[in-house]
Amino acid sequence: MTTIVCVRKDGKVAIGGDGQATLGNCVEKGTVRKVRRLYKDKVITGFAGSTADAFILRDLFEKKLELHQGHLVKSAVELAKEWRTERALRKLEAMMIVANESEFLLVSGSGDVIEPEQDVLAIGSGGNFAKSAALALLRTENNLTAKQIVAEALKIAGDIDIYSNHNHVIEEV
């Protein structure tokens, strides 16, 4: 359970996430880093779901990026295919948002690789709260950057979602 949100605005893409890890109904850690840079710092990924599963998937995605020389869509599709067909990976419970400077995608274990129609994508238990906040901020006249919109969306989600906190990591490309 977490909040990961991605926003594209004015040629920049930002992904942010909270840092809370829960076990059942208890907070176990508040400083988990769920957003990371990959492939020569040109790709950002954020994950929601089981932490260990997400780390495995992030490592697999990084290998796909290296294999496909940083091609985001090809790497994401190859990861989704392997995730869905490999028996051991099928049981992994996590979702990822992956982004570079021009595109961003949702990747899931059911084989989904989705490019959103709007400039916002969010996952996790607080994802709908963050997505709503980010869309509202994108639709209003303001001078906020993609990174600032992500920060505000995470604050709102953290205020509402009990499985998200206010320890945020935000990366931008």
Swiss-Prot record:
Subcellular location field: Cytoplasm
Record's keyword annotation contains Hydrolase: yes
Activity modulation comment: Allosterically activated by HslU binding.
Keywords noted in UniProt: Allosteric enzyme, Cytoplasm, Hydrolase, Metal-binding, Protease, Sodium, Threonine protease
Binding locations of Na(+): G158, D161, S164
UniProt-listed GO biological process terms: proteolysis involved in protein catabolic process
Enzyme class: hydrolase
CDD domains: protease_HslV
Cellular compartments per GO CC: HslUV protease complex; proteasome core complex
Chief subcellular location: cytoplasm
Subunit-structure text: A double ring-shaped homohexamer of HslV is capped on each side by a ring-shaped HslU homohexamer. The assembly of the HslU/HslV complex is dependent on binding of ATP.
Family under the similarity heading: Belongs to the peptidase T1B family. HslV subfamily.
Function description: Protease subunit of a proteasome-like degradation complex believed to be a general protein degrading machinery.
NCBIfam families attached to this UniProt entry: ATP_dep_HslV, PRK05456.1
Protein name, UniProt field: ATP-dependent protease subunit HslV
